[in-house]
From Swiss-Prot:
This is Arabinogalactan protein 40. Induction: Up-regulated by AHL16/TEK. The gene is AGP40. Belongs to the AG-peptide AGP family. Residues 1-22 form the signal peptide.
Amino acid sequence: MEMKNIFVALFISAVLVSSVSAATMESPAPSPGASSASTVAFPVVGSIVAASLSAFLALLLQ
């Protein structure tokens, strides 16, 4: 049972990391004009959410 919990936690962490890395892939160049800081901060917020969810899941499965 312990190995199953570890496997599930690692699997979900890997899924979260891959989803965050997919969100940070190259995008087309921004158009000239007003730029938004939220587009720059989105990958950071995504990685924080993924780390928080994986930590919660690890505590839940402990």
